[in-house]
């Protein structure tokens, strides 16, 4: 059975008579790499295989997002490790910085997918 390539399916629906450009498919990786370069590269590979045009990560440091005393506002009931602080949750996933994202960008280039990241502050831009 042929795998469904979401990008081909959606872009194919635009049609030849439609003057609009086909949509860009952006896979949202966020911080789902959990600080693992191997997992980040796997997310890139799977997004490319699935037909995404780009993959988007998130760039931030916990210190710029939340007070150390802020209570968690994510539902942590399904997490293996619960926490009493939003700061600690952000800190758990802020392990990548410019060097790591440069490595991911090179991997994106090698598999033919555009690298994007949402910066959460000036320094992350």
Can you say where each PLM-predicted feature lies in the sequence?
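Active-site glycine- and acidic-residue-rich loops that bind
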Residues: 32-38
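Glycine-rich, proline-tolerant flexible connector loops at the mouths of alpha/beta enzymes
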Residues: 53-95
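Active-site beta->alpha loop and helix N-cap motifs at the rims of alpha/beta catalytic domains
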Residues: 80-125
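Active-site beta-loop-alpha junctions enriched in small/polar residues
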Residues: 30-32, 58-62, 120-122
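Hydrophobic faces of well-ordered beta-strands that scaffold small-molecule active sites
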Residues: 25-29, 55-57, 115-118
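Generic structural "secondary-structure junction" signal
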Residues: 6-8, 12, 33, 62, ...
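Alpha/beta enzyme core
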Residues: 39-57, 76, 106, 110, ...
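N-terminal amphipathic alpha-helix/helix-capping segment at the start of soluble metabolic enzymes
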Residues: 1-26, 101
């Amino acid at each position: 059975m042929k795998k469904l390539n979401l990008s081909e399916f959606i872009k194919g629906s635009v049609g030849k008579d439609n003057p609009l450009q086909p949509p860009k498919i952006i896979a949202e990786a966020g911080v789902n790499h959990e600080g693992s370069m191997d997992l980040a590269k796997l997310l890139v590979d799977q997004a490319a295989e699935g037909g995404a045009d780009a993959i988007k990560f998130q760039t931030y440091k916990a210190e710029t997002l939340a007070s150390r005393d802020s209570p968690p506002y994510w539902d942590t009931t399904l997490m293996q490790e619960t926490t009493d602080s939003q700061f600690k949750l952000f800190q758990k996933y802020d392990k990548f910085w410019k060097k790591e994202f440069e490595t991911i960008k090179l991997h994106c280039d090698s598999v033919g997918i555009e690298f994007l990241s949402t910066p959460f502050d000036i320094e992350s831009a």
